From Swiss-Prot:
Binding site for UDP-N-acetyl-alpha-D-glucosamine: 11-14, 25, 75, 80-81, 102-104, 138, 153, 168, 226, 332, 350, 365, 376
Principal location listed in the UniProt entry: cytoplasm
Alphabetical UniProt keywords: Acyltransferase, Cell shape, Cell wall biogenesis/degradation, Cytoplasm, Magnesium, Metal-binding, Multifunctional enzyme, Nucleotidyltransferase, Peptidoglycan synthesis, Repeat, Transferase
Lineage, uppermost ranks: Bacteria, Pseudomonadati, Pseudomonadota, Betaproteobacteria, Neisseriales
Active site: 362
Family from the record: In the N-terminal section; belongs to the N-acetylglucosamine-1-phosphate uridyltransferase family. In the C-terminal section; belongs to the transferase hexapeptide repeat family.
Annotated protein name in UniProt: Bifunctional protein GlmU
Xref: SUPFAM superfamilies: Nucleotide-diphospho-sugar transferases, Trimeric LpxA-like enzymes
UniProt source species: Neisseria meningitidis serogroup A / serotype 4A (strain DSM 15465 / Z2491)
Length: 456
C-alpha cells in the first residue's frame, strides 16, 4: 500500500460534562451543523482512504443524528485519547498515515490540515498553538536545538514546563507502520490514570522519528469546545467569517454583527440584508433581492427584485421575481409563488401554488391550494383545508375576487373571474364568471332597546 495512504480517526466519545446537557457534546451545533458533522465534512475533503469516528457516550444518538458514510467505532470505556485511537486500529491501513482529529474542534479547516500533512511527510506532524492563556493545556517541550521532544499535560507538568506558552492542539499525523506498537506500549501511570495519545511524541523521538510541528495560523481553528461559553464564542467567530465573505462578494449587510447563516447562501448581485436575519439550510437569493429586518428564511429560493419585509418567516418555499412579501408574512413548505405576487401582513401560505400577479394582502390563510393569476383575496379569507382527518385541495382560477372574511371549504373549485361576496362560506364549486353569495340576509329590528347598566 502506498505511503501516502491517509486514514483519519475522529475522537468523539466524550460526555461533555461541562456542557450541562443531556445531548452528547459533539452534537451541539455551530452554524446550524453539529460539531461532529463539520469535522467529518472537513476530513472527507482530504479524500482519505477511510474515516473512523470513535464514539462512546450517547452512541445511538450520535449515529441517529450524524448521517455520514464513515466507520463507527465504539469506545466502551473512557480510558483516554490513546485508548480511543487504539480502538480504531483494526480499521486502519498497515502503511500510510493516520490523522487524528476531534469532534469538538469544529472550525478546523482543510488548508490547515493540508499544511500539516505536507510538513509531516511520512513522519510525525503536530499542530501547535500559542494562545493568550495556555492554562489547562498540554505543553510542547523542545530541546536546546528547538526540536520537539515531548508533550506534557498540565497536570503532570512541573513549574518550568508550565511556563511554556506553546501548547498541543491534539491534532497530529502518525505513521501507521509504528502506530500499533506505540499504542500498545502506552502506560496509564499519570495524574489522570489514562492512556495519553500525546505520549506517542516521546516514543517517536526515542525511535529516531522526527517531529514536525506546525503552528496553527489562528487559535480558533484548533479551539475545542468544553462549555456553552466556548461554543458561543466559536459560533460568533464563524458567523463573522461568513459575513465577511458575503461582504467581499458584494452582499450588503446592514450590520454584519447581527447576521446569522446556518447553512449555504447563494446570491446574485445587489442583494441587501437588514439586521437580525437568520438564514438556514439552502438559500438562493436573486439579483436585487431585499430582506427586511428580523426575517427567518430556511431552505428557500427568492427570485430577482423581490422584497421581503420585516418579521417574515419563509421555509421550504419558492418565491418568483418582483414579489412583495410581508411584513409579518409566513410562507410554509411547498408554497410556490409565481412572479409579481403580493403577500401581506399576517398571511400564511402552505403547500400552495400562487399564480402571477395574485394578491393576498391581509389576514389570510391559503393551504393546499392551486390559485391562478391576478386573483385577489380579501382580508380575513380562510381556506378550510382540513376536515379533522384529511387535507383537501382547493382550486381557484384566474382573476377571481374573494370577498373579505370568506371561508372556502375544501375540496372546492372556483372558476375564472368568479366573485364571492364578503362573509360567504363557499362549500360548492362555482362556475366561471359567477357571483357566489353564502350568507344570511341582514335583518334590522326597529324599536329595539339596548340594555344599559343600572347607574346607582
Amino acid at each position: 500500500m502506498p505511503q501516502n495512504t491517509l486514514n483519519i480517526v475522529i475522537l468523539a466519545a466524550g460526555k461533555g460534562t461541562r456542557m450541562y446537557s443531556k445531548m452528547p457534546k459533539v452534537l451541539h451545533e455551530i452554524g446550524g451543523e453539529t460539531m461532529l458533522g463539520r469535522v467529518i465534512d472537513t476530513a472527507a475533503a482530504l479524500n482519505p482512504q477511510n474515516i473512523c469516528v470513535v464514539v462512546g457516550h450517547g452512541k445511538e444518538q450520535v449515529l441517529d443524528t450524524v448521517k455520514r458514510d464513515v466507520v463507527w467505532v465504539e469506545q466502551t470505556e473512557q480510558l483516554g485519547t490513546g485508548h480511543a485511537v487504539k480502538t480504531a486500529l483494526p480499521h486502519l491501513a498497515a502503511e500510510g498515515r493516520t490523522l487524528v482529529l476531534y469532534g469538538d474542534v469544529p472550525l478546523i479547516d482543510v488548508e490547515t490540515l493540508e499544511t500539516l500533512l505536507e510538513a509531516a511527510g511520512n513522519e510525525v506532524g503536530l499542530l501547535t498553538d500559542v494562545p493568550a492563556d495556555p492554562s489547562g493545556l498540554g505543553r510542547i517541550i523542545r530541546d536546546s536545538s528547538g526540536s520537539v521532544t515531548a508533550i506534557v499535560e498540565e497536570k503532570d507538568a512541573d513549574a518550568a514546563q508550565k511556563a511554556v506558552k506553546e501548547i498541543n492542539t491534539g491534532i497530529l499525523v502518525l505513521p501507521n507502520a509504528k502506530l500499533e506498537a506505540w499504542l500498545n506500549s502506552l502506560s496509564s501511570n499519570n495524574a489522570q490514570g489514562e492512556y495519553y495519545l500525546t505520549d506517542l511524541i516521546a516514543k517517536a523521538v526515542a525511535d529516531g522519528i522526527k517531529i514536525h510541528p506546525v503552528q496553527v495560523r489562528s487559535s480558533h481553528l484548533a479551539a475545542g469546545v468544553n462549555n456553552k461559553l466556548q461554543l458561543a464564542e466559536l459560533e460568533r467567530i464563524f458567523q463573522t467569517e461568513q459575513a465577511q465573505e458575503l461582504l467581499k462578494a458584494g452582499v450588503t449587510l446592514r450590520d454584519p454583527a447581527r447576521f446569522d447563516l446556518r447553512g449555504r447562501l447563494k446570491h446574485g448581485q445587489d442583494v441587501v440584508i437588514d439586521v437580525n436575519c437568520i438564514f438556514e439550510g439552502k438559500i438562493e437569493l436573486g439579483d436585487n433581492v431585499e430582506i427586511g429586518a428580523n426575517c427567518v428564511i430556511k431552505n428557500a429560493k427568492i427570485g430577482a427584485n423581490s422584497k421581503i419585509a420585516p418579521f417574515s418567516h419563509l421555509e421550504g418555499c419558492e418565491v418568483g421575481e418582483n414579489n412583495q412579501i410581508g411584513p409579518y408574512a409566513r410562507l410554509r413548505p411547498q408554497a410556490k409563488l409565481a412572479d409579481d405576487v403580493h403577500v401581506g401582513n399576517f398571511v400564511e401560505i402552505k403547500n400552495a401554488a400562487i399564480g402571477k400577479g395574485t394578491k393576498a394582502n391581509h389576514l389570510t390563510y391559503i393551504g393546499d391550494a392551486e390559485v391562478g393569476s391576478k386573483t385577489n383575496f380579501g382580508a380575513g379569507t380562510i381556506i378550510a383545508n382540513y376536515d379533522g382527518v384529511h387535507k383537501h385541495k382547493t382550486v381557484i382560477g384566474d382573476e377571481v375576487r374573494i370577498g373579505s372574511n370568506c371561508v372556502l371549504v375544501s375540496p372546492v373549485k372556483i372558476g375564472n373571474k368568479v366573485t364571492t361576496g364578503a362573509g360567504s362560506t363557499i362549500t360548492r364549486n362555482v362556475e366561471d364568471g359567477k357571483l357566489a353569495l353564502a350568507r344570511s340576509r341582514q335583518t334590522i329590528i326597529d324599536g329595539w332597546v339596548r340594555p344599559e347598566k343600572n347607574k346607582q
